[in-house]
Regions:
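Rossmann-fold dinucleotide-binding core
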Residues: 14, 79-80, 96-98, 102-186
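Well-ordered, non-membrane alpha-helical segments in soluble/globular domains
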Residues: 88-98, 124-127, 306-317
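Structural motif
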Residues: 8-11, 31-33, 79-81, 113-116, ...
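NAD(P)-dependent dehydrogenase/reductase Rossmann-like domain
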Residues: 228-229, 257-401
Length: 401
């Protein structure tokens, strides 16, 4: 049975590790921060569904040095967490790639799950060759397989050379279905998908600025703006930045990508402006208003953009309204919804609740509705149209403010 290493203590990495382990593959998962490799057995994969549940169980797990795990791996799935500032993300990833290259055995296949931008595979392969001393033609294989956020579904599969049958068999166990392309074509496909997604959303972000609240909601029903929240908008910022940075200078597409990036990056500021405008229109004083940021973020997912934007929004809100807390409904979150609700309701001030996703909004709304909790709430959906609803006492019919 072939040896597998998943390099990266990430949500996506654990999904890959547990999926393969449950099918009998010997799998080790590298925690790049703790510098240990943990064996993921079928029993662990069955018992532990989410990565946070694996933490703190060191006594029950088989651990080995990272070097030993990489030396034995025929397949290395590269799925680390990227947490540094966007300008430093490249050096962060490269340092982790060097560790892989330094210890991988001859004949290994490296499957790269982060986005790389256009031409990124050439830089990555060159680094792997230089550090490992192996040739990409004979010494190792490289596959580009950027994953969609929080999933193990790749946007595409890009190969340096004709893939072996064993590799396709392994990919089939993970449910990888995209047709195989060359690395350059795969990077172009991924870049076009990212640009296509954000080029549709960016005009809406700007266009809704010129409309009143009720008009925005009506138009949002037609264009789908009500369905896109800050959670989705921030989920692939790393991809967008890498694509924009890798485009040839002076090309028209560079200006398009740069402007889209500027618009999307400004959405956090837009949320803050909408909160200020709403409080002003309702004559709410900052000193008597409690703000709840109800947004589930996964601190273990590979891309760190959602986490960073959540933190930035929370800090900017705190600069304006000092009484602010956070809550979450996600299973991976360390925030307990029931406890947070009791904490929120203990305050007599008006509660302004900003939801970062539809699932967060529905979870909190349903809980408040079922409990019949008394109080006055103003809900803001942090979607493209900034849908706003209010409810008083136990009535949850809601209506636009």
């Amino acid at each position: 049975m072939v040896g597998v290493v998943v390099y990266g203590f990430s949500t996506e990495g654990y999904q890959i590790a547990s999926t393969l382990a449950s099918q009998g593959f010997p799998v080790s998962m590298v925690d790049e921060e703790m510098q240990i490799a943990t064996e993921i057995t079928p029993a662990i994969a069955k018992a532990i569904r989410a990565l946070p549940d694996l933490i703190g169980r060191d006594q029950l797990l088989s651990i080995k040095p990272v070097e030993a795990a990489l030396n034995e791996a025929e397949y290395i799935f590269f799925a680390p967490r990227v947490r540094r500032h966007p300008e430093e993300a490249g050096s962060e990833v490269n340092s982790k790639l060097r560790e892989v290259a330094k210890n991988m055995m001859k004949g290994a296949t490296v499957i790269y799950h982060l986005p790389s931008g256009l031409g990124g595979f050439e830089t990555i392969v060159t680094l792997l060759e230089k550090v490992s001393g192996l040739s990409s033609k004979e010494g190792f294989e490289y596959v580009y397989a950027p994953l969609k956020p929080r999933t193990i579904e790749p946007y595409c599969l890009g190969f340096l050379s004709k893939p072996k049958k064993n590799l396709f068999n392994l990919f089939s166990k993970l449910g990888f279905k995209p047709a195989g392309l060359g690395c350059r074509s795969a990077e172009a496909l991924h870049a076009l998908k990212i640009l296509g997604t954000y080029s549709t959303l960016a005009p809406q972000i700007e266009g809704y600025k010129f409309l009143e609240s009720s008009e925005r909601v009506k138009l949002g029903r037609l264009l789908g703006g009500r369905d896109v929240f800050i959670d989705t908008l921030s989920s692939q910022m790393l991809d967008l930045r890498l694509v924009a940075a890798s485009l040839p200078p002076k090309e028209p597409l560079v200006h398009l990508a740069s402007n889209i990036l500027k618009i999307v990056e400004g959405f956090t500021k837009r949320v803050l402006e909408e909160v200020r405008a709403l409080m002003k229109s309702l004559e709410l004083k900052a000193s008597k208003t409690k703000v709840i940021l109800n947004w589930s973020v996964d601190r273990y997912e590979m891309r760190g953009d959602r986490l960073g934007i959540h933190q930035s929004l929370r800090e900017k809100l705190r600069d304006y309204v000092s009484d602010i807390s956070t809550t979450s409904s996600a299973p991976w979150s360390e925030s307990n919804l029931e406890f947070k609700l009791k904490e929120i309701l203990a305050e007599p001030s008006v509660k302004l609740i900003i939801s970062g996703s539809q699932s967060d909004h529905e979870a909190l709304w349903d809980r408040l509705s079922k409990e019949g909790l008394l109080g006055e709430y103003i809900f803001i959906k942090a979607n493209l149209v900034f849908e706003t609803m209010s409810t008083k006492t136990a009535r949850f019919g809601g209506g636009y403010v």
